[in-house]
Amino acid sequence: MRPVSLAIAAMLAASTAAGASPVPAPVTSAADTSVPRVLVFTRTAGYRHDAIPTTIETLRALGAQVGVEIEASEDPTHFDDATLAGYRAVVFAHTTREVLDIEQQAAFERYVGHGGGYLGIHAAADSGYTWPWYGALVGAWFARHPEGLQAVRVVFEQDAAPLGRRDWRVVDEIYDYRRNPRADVRVIASVDPHSHATGGMGDDHPIAWCHTRAGGRAWYTGLGHDPALYADPVFRAHLLQGLRWTTGQSDDC
């Protein structure tokens, strides 16, 4: 195991009874000069997405742009206090169904509670159905999707538009969710309901959002099923926003 980040390690060593900051600060310190590391976790216990290798490759390229080292693994034993302390953020990339045991779940809860970042991509919402804490972290669980890829209009919030593109036409698999998360998160982007085949979310269909959770930062996008989407500059900029925010490089998700 590599040397852990001094900042996160110090926070994890603190009493869990200590109050967490409502707006978590970047998990770094003057004494910590190491390159920030991010774990991309890709374990699946259900459907396995073809986009996983492309997702890893894209995140590595984006990480290189902002000085973040990306480490990809399907090994759930990374989820213990000491190992998680070495990461600035953890990405759940297309994880499906139950991918962590009870002890690993508890370690991840402590990690986020002490300022660690979480970034979920697409099927990350198809995970952890028996883990209520995770359901709150990801924001909403997957419900259904129309068959095949859909050509839809995605509308970004004014201050969250990547590359200044508020209105974006995209072809991808579009999820409906079991609940609308808007009341509990900051919505980054929504699907135009008139361009979606099922319309199962009604007139308000969030597809990407962020929020703070128990001291950490959580960011999720429902896009990313189609490997071809990762070549789109708008989608890459969208992912980069999430990577920068969850690693504490940006105060705006």
Per-range role (PLM):
Residues Y134-W141, Y177-V185, V234-Q249:
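Oxidoreductase and adenylate-handling cofactor-binding alpha/beta cores
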Residues S5-T16:
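Bacterial N-terminal signal peptides
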Residues A140, R144-G215:
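Catalytic beta-strand/loop cores that center a nucleophilic Ser/Cys/Thr
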Residues T96-G164:
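A glycine-rich, often tryptophan-bearing local segment used as a flexible ligand/cofactor-contacting loop or short
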Residues A31-P36, T42, D50-P53, E57, ...:
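Extracellular ligand-binding/catalytic regions of CAZymes and related secreted enzymes
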Residues S29-D32, R37-S127:
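Helical hinge/lid and interdomain linker segments adjacent to catalytic or ligand-binding clefts
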Residues A17-S29:
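Signal peptide processing junction and immediate N-terminal pro/mature segment
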